Amino acid sequence: MRRGGACVQKKEYLPLTSRQPGVCLLSEILVRALEARSFFLVVVTVPAGEVAYAESQVACDSRLSAFPSRTRPVILYVPGAHTRSASVRAGLDAMATHAPDVVLVHDGARPFVSVALIHSVLEATCRYGAAVPVIEATDTPKGVAADGSIETHLIRSRVRLAQTPQGFCYASLCAAHHRAATDGEQYTDDSELYARYGGTVHVCAGERSNVKITYPEDLEQRASEPALTRGISVLPCTEEGALRVGLGTDMHALCAGRPLILAGIHIPSKKGAQGHSDADVLAHASIDALLGAAGLGDIGTFFPSCDGRWKDAHSCALLRHTWQLVRAACWRLVNLDAVVCLEQPALHPFREAMRASLAQALDTHVTRVFVKAKTAERLGPVGSGAAVTAQVVVLLKKI
């Protein structure tokens, strides 16, 4: 969330409705961010000298205190600068000690962002690395020259209107912002800046209700709608404590000359699994189970075999990265239960090492992880020694 020091009219402090003067645009955004239960840190940049005032305005909204303190993210107010880009950069720099994987940048003049849109942008960002919500243009856009004449007739079907929040890999966005500062360049939004310095930005569906308050009549129009005239009554998200089950399976062919890796543990064997990475079926099935339970996608979404970056990759490192994404979405691991099916060699001697390795990758106690080893009784491709398989079930709890 951003406020630049050059803004004269402080729209973010305006009351959302006359019936609830304690609810301002900024506090409404914060309530919706807390409702999403997907953030551990929220940074608000405000004009220099206005930190205390911003805090006092937000404190007037009693809804914020209704969120449990143990799950409430830290809200940090940071002095901004005289340009939009510099203010965003100040906010990003304030996050450096927290080292987030993903960051969403939201305009403080868009108070009607929905929790569903926040989750949609987060999911697309985790999948692609950068994502922006867009809506179709309903009016026919024109490119206008300095003298007021139309110089370009844009194709409306190919034009989209960008909204916020816009999501990015934190480290990549920081690097792009600092390069832009060095070059002295200014951009109207972060997706343009990110793309200018080599990043690819994908789009996801925005919402027409996610309007930007630019003129007084924008707020007046929204305030007259029934949902707002009834008053705003937002309770903490009922998703807290929700349980989700995920299932992951994987199978790889076995061949001579390859190492056999299971949960990051090297298993002495005449044959190993074929694959683009280290072909660790137990780690791969665990990744799929976690992503499925959290509703974030699957292993092919994040680590496609066509991507050379994952050639011979250590799958437990991919599992650790996956868990960071799942944890950032406010999920806690209740337990993981796995079955590995391999005809030979016998896996029982390595079972505890595999449990410990998975627990370490998931930053959890080993008692929450269990691994069972089976044979296929000489049936099918596993029984003939041609393949190895794994099945994993996880239980996640929303926090």
From Swiss-Prot:
Sites annotated Transition state stabilizer: R3, H276, T375
Gene3D superfamilies according to UniProt: 2-C-methyl-D-erythritol 2,4-cyclodiphosphate synthase, Spore Coat Polysaccharide Biosynthesis Protein SpsA, Chain A
Annotated region (2-C-methyl-D-erythritol 2,4-cyclodiphosphate synthase), positions in chain: 244-399
Region (2-C-methyl-D-erythritol 4-phosphate cytidylyltransferase): 1-243
Residues that coordinate or bind a divalent metal cation: D250, H252, H284
Cofactor(s) essential for the protein: a divalent metal cation
GO-annotated biological processes: isopentenyl diphosphate biosynthetic process, methylerythritol 4-phosphate pathway; terpenoid biosynthetic process
Residue sites binding 4-CDP-2-C-methyl-D-erythritol 2-phosphate per the record: D250, M251, H252, H276, S277, D298, I299, G300
Entry keywords, A to Z: Isoprene biosynthesis, Lyase, Metal-binding, Multifunctional enzyme, Nucleotidyltransferase, Transferase
Catalysed reaction, written as an equation: 2-C-methyl-D-erythritol 4-phosphate + CTP + H(+) = 4-CDP-2-C-methyl-D-erythritol + diphosphate; 4-CDP-2-C-methyl-D-erythritol 2-phosphate = 2-C-methyl-D-erythritol 2,4-cyclic diphosphate + CMP
Residue intervals passing through the bilayer: none
Enzyme Commission number(s) from the entry: 2.7.7.60, 4.6.1.12
Residues under site feature: Positions MEP for the nucleophilic attack: R156, K212
Any one Gene Ontology molecular-function term assigned to this protein's record: 2-C-methyl-D-erythritol 4-phosphate cytidylyltransferase activity
Metabolic or biological pathway: Isoprenoid biosynthesis; isopentenyl diphosphate biosynthesis via DXP pathway; isopentenyl diphosphate from 1-deoxy-D-xylulose 5-phosphate: step 2/6; Isoprenoid biosynthesis; isopentenyl diphosphate biosynthesis via DXP pathway; isopentenyl diphosphate from 1-deoxy-D-xylulose 5-phosphate: step 4/6
Family that this chain belongs to: In the N-terminal section; belongs to the IspD/TarI cytidylyltransferase family. IspD subfamily. In the C-terminal section; belongs to the IspF family.
Protein task: Bifunctional enzyme that catalyzes the formation of 4-diphosphocytidyl-2-C-methyl-D-erythritol from CTP and 2-C-methyl-D-erythritol 4-phosphate (MEP) (IspD), and catalyzes the conversion of 4-diphosphocytidyl-2-C-methyl-D-erythritol 2-phosphate (CDP-ME2P) to 2-C-methyl-D-erythritol 2,4-cyclodiphosphate (ME-CPP) with a corresponding release of cytidine 5-monophosphate (CMP) (IspF).
NCBIfam families membership: ispF
Record protein name field: Bifunctional enzyme IspD/IspF
Organism: Treponema pallidum (strain Nichols)
Lineage: Bacteria, Pseudomonadati, Spirochaetota, Spirochaetia, Spirochaetales
Gene: ispDF
